[in-house]
């Protein structure tokens, strides 16, 4: 259709030009051929860009006594039902969770899931507009607030230029044909024909440049999302087109406290002291909190967001001594950060207890400090491990540690805290995306390559998942001088 419109317009324009100036047929043919070639070569398919989350949201939540994985299925730019999956793990209590999808000025939608045996439970809510939303997961005692985005259908400026250009060219084509047939003066027909070619040039140029134009900064990833900037992210580009924009943000400060079986974490902006409420989901969680007890037991928990900058998790500090911890977070504009803190045990009379038995076997080929070592963990004999937090395995490394009764106190000042991963291997023919915890086909061996920075004794823990149970295998590794 576009080629026909171009040919007709060119013939109309060229006929008028020939009548007025006496151009040769060869010149007319070359002129027509040039425009047809430009039209055929320079018109790729131009589609609208969807701004927002392009994938499902997977986030771990240590809610009450449960270790949950909440999956918010992608919705938008075409609005529809909001599908939510909740994975409960072995050891989690049965019960009912109330789910609420909320956004200021939007219709609130509610639902619930009834948890039973370990597995996946689903609910369907509704969202009625694009913008930033919160999914509230309430167990009756604590309400976890998970931020997510509903993307909008966004038309980029070059797509608008292309659409308007083609529309104007079509309208001017009709005017040009009518003027050619009815005008008594040849130059009058030349005006709409020339305008049509200009409009067509704008349209073809916009369509040609569309695949090569960079997307605008992403709301929710580069800067704080609002209803306005999700609907029109290009407005921010236009208003800041004079100079480059610095989206960086300062580090975060962490203050931790414990009491009444609850561990509280407050995050504040180091430049302003205000609550830091711009965390991104990083490796399947808003916060990865690693806690080492006085006896050397490691806990990997994911505090839930209860208010801006405030996070909580159920945690009993039953040992006397120091509970050392690090919080691994990713801040919008601030990158990945590792924050340290500690709390004291709440039972002065209680002494450190023995660590729980290992649920796997670890062997290591240890190289001198600074060189790559190989750590292998084996969990059972069957290849049925499940991905947890998007990974087959997690390895926590703390050290070097001196000898002493309070391991938590030594861990607090240890120079090395590391969190390594064993990635999910790509599946042949897979279309992409993160496999959920229903996929049980990995292992039983998990291998890590890690370089210990300093010589000394390290505590190492490897974690994975099988049959919806989180398994942990601890070991000590001695690293020699290079």
Where are these regions (language model features)?
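Beta-strand-rich structural segments
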Residues: 80-90, 260-274, 327, 371-383
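Residue-level recognition of secondary-structure-to-loop junctions
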Residues: 115, 125-129, 305, 312-318, ...
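Extended, hydrophilic extramembrane loops/domains of integral membrane proteins
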Residues: 124-151
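Alpha-helical transmembrane segments
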Residues: 171-184
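Internal/C-terminal transmembrane anchor helices
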Residues: 187-214
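Membrane-interface segments at or immediately adjacent to transmembrane helices
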Residues: 210-282, 319
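Hydrophobic, ordered structural segments
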Residues: 305-352
């Amino acid at each position: 259709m576009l080629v026909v419109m171009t040919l007709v317009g060119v013939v109309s324009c060229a006929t008028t030009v020939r009548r007025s100036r006496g151009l040769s047929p060869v010149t007319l043919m070359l002129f027509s051929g040039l425009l047809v070639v430009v039209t055929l070569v320079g018109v790729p398919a131009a589609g609208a860009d969807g701004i927002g989350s392009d994938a499902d949201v997977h986030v771990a939540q240590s809610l009450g006594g449960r270790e949950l994985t909440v999956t918010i299925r992608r919705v938008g730019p075409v609005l529809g039902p909001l599908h939510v999956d909740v994975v409960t793990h072995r050891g989690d209590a049965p019960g009912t969770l109330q789910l609420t999808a909320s956004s200021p000025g939007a219709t609130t939608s509610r639902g619930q899931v009834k948890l039973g045996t370990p597995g996946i439970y689903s609910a369907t809510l509704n969202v009625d507009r694009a913008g930033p939303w919160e999914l509230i997961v309430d167990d009756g005692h604590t309400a976890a607030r998970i931020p997510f985005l509903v993307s909008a259908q966004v038309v980029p400026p070059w797509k608008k230029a292309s659409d308007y250009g083609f529309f104007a060219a079509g309208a001017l084509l009709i005017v040009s044909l009518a003027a050619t047939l009815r005008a008594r003066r040849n130059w009058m027909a030349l005006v709409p024909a020339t305008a049509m070619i200009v409009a067509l040039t704008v349209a073809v140029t916009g369509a040609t440049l569309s695949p090569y134009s960079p997307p605008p900064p992403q709301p929710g990833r580069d800067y704080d999302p609002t209803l306005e900037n999700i609907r029109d992210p290009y407005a921010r580009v236009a208003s800041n087109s004079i100079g480059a924009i610095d989206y960086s943000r300062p580090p975060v400060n962490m203050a931790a406290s414990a009491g009444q079986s609850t561990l509280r974490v407050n995050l504040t902006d180091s430049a302003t002291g205000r609550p830091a409420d711009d965390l991104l989901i990083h490796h399947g969680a808003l916060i990865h909190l690693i806690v080492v007890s006085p006896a050397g037991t490691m806990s990997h928990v994911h505090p839930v967001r209860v208010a801006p900058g405030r996070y909580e998790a159920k945690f009993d500090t039953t040992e006397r001594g120091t509970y050392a911890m690090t919080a691994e977070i990713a801040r919008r504009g601030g990158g990945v950060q590792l924050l340290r803190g500690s709390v004291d045990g709440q039972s002065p009379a209680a002494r450190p207890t023995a660590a729980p038995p290992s649920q796997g076997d670890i062997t290591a080929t240890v190289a001198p400090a600074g060189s790559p070592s190989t750590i292998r963990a084996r969990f059972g004999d069957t290849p049925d491990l499940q991905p947890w937090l998007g990974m087959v395995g997690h390895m926590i490394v703390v050290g070097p540690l001196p000898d002493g009764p309070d391991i938590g106190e030594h861990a607090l000042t240890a120079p090395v805290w590391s969190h390594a991963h064993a990635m999910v291997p790509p599946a042949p023919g897979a279309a992409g995306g993160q496999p959920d915890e229903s996929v049980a086909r990995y292992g039983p061996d998990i291998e890590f390559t890690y370089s210990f920075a300093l010589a000394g004794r390290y505590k190492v823990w490897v974690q994975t998942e099988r049959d919806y149970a989180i398994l942990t295998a601890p070991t000590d590794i001695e690293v020699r001088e290079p």
